[in-house]
């Protein structure tokens, strides 16, 4: 499509009158929640091309693409404006408890209609019609009228239904979700503050690990942290990964967020292991010993080797007989998982047989022609992968039980990834939920001047509404099933996401807006029912109203000391931090604090060719930031002396965040033991840096095992500091 840029920075079709095209594009984009421009990192307004808009609108289900004319756009706009008039009820209504909610009902003009609410417990009642006149519209040659009804303000929280019965016998139903106005929990309503620990579970190993931290290690780590006074343990996402090599190392690129990664299973902790025949146990012990020996020789975590050994061990245990009680538990788990669990397990079995997650076309989606036949042929492997999910859930549930039993107020804090792999089971099972031909990413900023493409397909806002937001509900329920809190990575994704058309650069995307009121409502409903705290990762450029909105809904934000600035780039004073937040010195995308003090991050970025400025300029900026931070630490009595040691600076930073009013304070385990290597170097792949494969080490590069933590001097000192100052 031939295009030119007009003076407003908006792309227009040069074959049509510019003003007409701008108006039509803006109207249809606005009507579908697609941004026609955005403010960049530098405060400049950037227009979005017509090509991008048309591709994105097409991905949203409209009959548009790059070749569309102004006439096509106008026809699509007509369809958009008539969409809600073509159905009796909206697909989903999300209403805050106590607030009431008015909704439209469309019927043949002049026809009567009755609308009932049906609660999840079966109780029923009628919705009242509101005296509000809206002129009828002609739809496909028929005059359609609109009536307005009201959701009673006193309906209880829950997943309910609306049922409309129209004169003539037509019946239509919709999902009705009554959600909390704000998350109400004792911890949030008290003046008490608590602290906890952030750890990458895969990197935190013990003498009993199979080369990677697991659920049994998690229980032990929680006990260690609780004994030191911590009230929560934040871990990386434990979502499902692919079942064959090469495994994806990033926990933030799972194949499904509904299901768990069986690599975190400890085979010996499965109940049936104890009753295995001696020969079977010897097979498992040999697999374990070989994996441990390899892990002790290598500097990095090898997920492929660990999973290959665990899979073989799990197959031995899976084949063992189970007691009636245990089999009954497994059967109930599979029944609750339903078709979603069955499809996930079948996807695993197919990928295992094909040796790749890029399945052939006749198996490329759950509705593909050969899939049901393969479900029968691969039934035993399907059973195995369903069993793995049961075992993983059981072991993670035990870790949360241990965390609470040893005194943690919150326990395990789960982490929820922003998206999934484009060839993963989540998209394979429900492709209609995702926008075709799109990837999620980020626009250019000061750190990534070409933008970012995360290679994750976005949920379609319309498809989510049509599904009653059940995929979101199930995802949140899964995250909270074995946790007392959830951190939502890039919580702005509940408001808007940067969509990039396939084949385009990350700079050629645009924002697509979601119904944040509905999505946050679903999250809060599930969190309220689970009694769980919700933390939103709201770093970066965020409109102030978004943070205000999250605060009003009872969601805690995230404050990182290096990102909290005031005039002149100076560190924000601790008393000015948000109280409704999790305050941190370090996060997984930053180097360990000791590594930053030593300049390791800048050296690495220079060696990898990632710096856009010369290294001395960057080092000068690092020195200035550390000098300003040091001055603040002195000012607030967080460090003493003119030349504090590296360890004193690290502890001083934690004294600083402990002085904030933030409800939660988190210490990174890497800081507690003096690690220096980054877990993740944003903007790099496995060819440049071993992201998400670095085991927990001390400042000399020696691995620190969980057994070492109770007596680790540096950790004990830092945790005692937090125990005494965060109340």
Predicted regions and their residues:
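Short helix/loop capping segments that flank catalytic or ligand/cofactor-binding pockets
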Residues: 39, 186-187, 207, 421-422, ...
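Alpha-amylase-like alpha-glycosidases and glucanotransferases acting on alpha-linked glucans and related
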Residues: 110, 244-393, 419-666, 670-671, ...
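Basic helix-extension-helix modules of the SAP/HeH family
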Residues: 10-63
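Intrinsically disordered, low-complexity segments enriched in serine/proline and basic residues
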Residues: 2-3
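Structured C-terminal cap/extension of enzyme domains
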Residues: 674-727
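Beta-strand-rich extracellular modules
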Residues: 165-169
């Amino acid at each position: 499509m031939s295009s030119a840029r007009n003076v407003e920075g908006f792309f227009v079709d040069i074959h049509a009158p510019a003003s007409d095209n701008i108006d039509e594009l803006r109207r249809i984009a606005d009507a579908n929640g697609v941004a026609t421009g955005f403010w960049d990192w530098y405060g400049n307004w950037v227009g979005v091309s017509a090509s991008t808009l048309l591709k994105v609108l097409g991905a949203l289900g409209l009959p548009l693409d790059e070749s569309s004319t102004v006439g096509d756009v106008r026809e699509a706009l007509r369809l958009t404006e008539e969409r809600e008039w073509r159905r009796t009820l909206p697909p989903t209504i999300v209403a805050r408890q106590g607030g009431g909610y008015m909704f439209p009902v469309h019927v043949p003009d002049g026809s009567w209609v009755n609308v009932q609410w049906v609660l999840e417990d079966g109780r029923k009642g009628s919705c009242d019609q509101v005296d509000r006149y809206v002129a009828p519209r002609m739809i496909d040659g028929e005059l359609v009228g609109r009536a307005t009804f009201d959701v009673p303000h006193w309906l209880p929280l829950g997943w309910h239904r609306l049922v409309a019965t129209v004169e003539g016998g037509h019946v239509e139903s919709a999902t009705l979700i009554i959600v909390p106005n704000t998350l109400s929990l004792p911890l949030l309503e008290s003046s008490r503050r608590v602290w906890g620990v952030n750890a990458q579970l895969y990197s935190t190993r013990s003498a009993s690990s199979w080369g990677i931290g697991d659920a049994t290690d998690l229980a032990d780590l929680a006990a260690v942290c609780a004994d030191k006074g911590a009230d929560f343990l934040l871990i990386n996402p434990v979502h499902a990964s692919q079942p064959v090599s090469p495994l994806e190392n990033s926990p933030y690129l799972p194949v499904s967020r509904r299901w768990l990664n069986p690599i975190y299973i400890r085979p010996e902790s499965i109940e049936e292991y104890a009753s295995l025949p001696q020969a079977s146990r010897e097979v498992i012990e040999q697999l374990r010993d070989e994996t441990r020996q390899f892990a002790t020789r290598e500097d990095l975590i090898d997920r492929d080797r660990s999973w290959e050994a665990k899979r073989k061990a799990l197959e031995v245990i899976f084949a063992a007989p189970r007691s009636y009680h245990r089999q009954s538990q497994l059967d109930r788990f599979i029944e609750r998982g339903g078709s979603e669990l069955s499809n996930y397990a079948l996807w695993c079995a197919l990928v295992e047989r094909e040796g790749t997650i890029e399945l052939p076309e006749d198996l490329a989606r759950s509705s593909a022609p050969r899939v049901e036949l393969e479900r029968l042929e691969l039934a035993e492997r399907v059973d195995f992968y369903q069993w793995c999910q049961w075992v993983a859930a059981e072991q993670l549930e035990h870790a949360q039980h241990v965390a609470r039993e040893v005194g943690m107020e919150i326990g395990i804090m789960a982490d929820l990834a922003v998206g999934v792999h484009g060839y993963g089971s989540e998209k394979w099972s429900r492709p209609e939920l995702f926008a075709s031909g799109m990837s999620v990413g980020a626009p250019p900023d000061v750190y990534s001047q070409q933008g970012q493409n995360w290679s994750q397909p976005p949920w379609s806002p319309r498809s989510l509404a049509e599904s009653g937001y059940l995929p979101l509900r199930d995802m949140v329920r899964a995250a909270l099933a074995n946790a007392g809190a959830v951190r939502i990575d890039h919580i702005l994704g509940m408001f808007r996401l940067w969509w990039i058309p396939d084949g385009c650069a990350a700079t050629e995307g645009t924002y697509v807006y979601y119904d944040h009121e509905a999505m946050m409502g679903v999250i809060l409903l599930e969190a309220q029912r689970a009694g769980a705290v919700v933390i939103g990762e709201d770093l970066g450029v965020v409109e102030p109203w978004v943070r205000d909105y999250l605060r009003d809904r009872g969601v805690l934000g995230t404050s990182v000391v290096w990102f909290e600035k005031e005039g002149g780039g100076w560190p924000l004073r601790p008393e000015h931090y948000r109280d409704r937040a999790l305050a941190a010195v370090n996060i997984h995308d930053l180097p360990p604090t000791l590594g930053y003090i030593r300049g390791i991050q800048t050296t690495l970025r220079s060696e990898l060719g990632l710096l856009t400025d010369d290294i001395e300029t960057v080092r000068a900026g690092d020195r200035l930031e550390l000098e300003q931070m040091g001055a603040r630490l002195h000012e607030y009595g967080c460090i003493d002396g003119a030349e504090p040691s590296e360890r004193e600076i690290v502890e001083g930073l934690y004294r600083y965040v402990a002085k904030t009013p933030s409800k939660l304070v988190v210490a990174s385990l890497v800081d507690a033991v003096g690690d220096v290597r980054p877990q993740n170097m944003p903007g790099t792949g496995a060819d440049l840096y071993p992201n998400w494969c670095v085991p927990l080490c001390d400042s000399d590069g020696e691995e620190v095992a969980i057994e070492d933590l109770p007596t680790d001097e540096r950790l004990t000192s830092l945790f005692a500091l937090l125990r005494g100052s965060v109340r």
